[in-house]
Regions:
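Conserved small/polar residues in nucleotide/adenosyl-binding loops
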Residues: 113-118
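Long, highly charged, low-complexity intrinsically disordered interaction regions
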Residues: 4-6, 10-111
């Protein structure tokens, strides 16, 4: 099990960061929130969640444990997959997600899920 990857960010694209860890580049799917916290060619630590399926092995990287916990909570909900969870967290990070849940803002959550399925 991987807990985090730490090293220089060598690729930073929408939805993707590659972190060089001792000469191995780990490609991590990231939210817009995490991307906003990273800088190309600078050191970073991403907490990772692995997704292993028959046809793919993906790493999802998060700038904080809080964001990672929100992702894991979201993906534990029936019908919410990784893509929808990443879309929800991209709209404002873990703070906005927590606020939406606490205030019962279903509109924000369902709008982001709808965008993820387009």
């Amino acid at each position: 099990m991987l807990y985090y990857v730490s090293g220089q960010v060598t690729v930073l694209e929408p939805g993707l960061a590659v972190v060089d860890c001792g000469g191995v580049g780990y490609g991590c799917r990231i939210t817009a929130y995490t991307a906003g916290q990273l800088k190309l060619n600078q050191a970073a630590r991403l907490y990772v969640t692995e997704s292993i399926r028959e046809d793919a092995f993906d790493l999802y990287g998060f700038i904080s444990k809080e964001e990672q916990r929100c992702y894991e909570l979201l993906t534990s909900v029936n019908g919410v997959g990784p893509k929808a969870a990443m879309a929800i967290l991209s709209s404002g990070g873990p703070q906005n997600f927590t606020l939406a849940v606490m205030t019962g803002n279903e509109k924000m959550l369902t709008a982001e899920i709808g965008r993820a399925h387009v």
